[in-house]
Amino acid sequence: MLNRELVKGSTVILVLTLLNERPMYGYELVKEMGSRSGNELQMKEGTLYPSLHKLERQGYISSYWEKQEKGPDRKYYRITDEGKEVLAERTKEWSVFSAMMDRILKWSGQNG
């Protein structure tokens, strides 16, 4: 199981990345993250929904309700233009951070 703080710190980039592909509802986001991570990432809905609400308040995503033939209506989330800009920035930051961590960990492993 992944460290909860690592997951929490990655929520924004994960959500924006998935919503950049297509609108999704909350449970769909949880399942998609789990599926793509080989079920290593088990984000709880109680973690996801506060993040979705915060992203919506910040203007990075928007939401809309869609009627379902069967079952209750679903609230879908989609990325906004501002969210796409934030995603581009965060993706660059992640690449730099990830490469830096790889260098440090590799160096430490060779010299430890």
From Swiss-Prot:
Pfam family name, one: PadR
CDD domains listed in its UniProt record: HTH_ARSR
GO molecular function: DNA binding
Source taxon at top rank: Bacteria
Keyword entries, A-Z: DNA-binding
Protein name: Putative DNA-binding protein YwzG
UniProt organism field: Bacillus subtilis (strain 168)
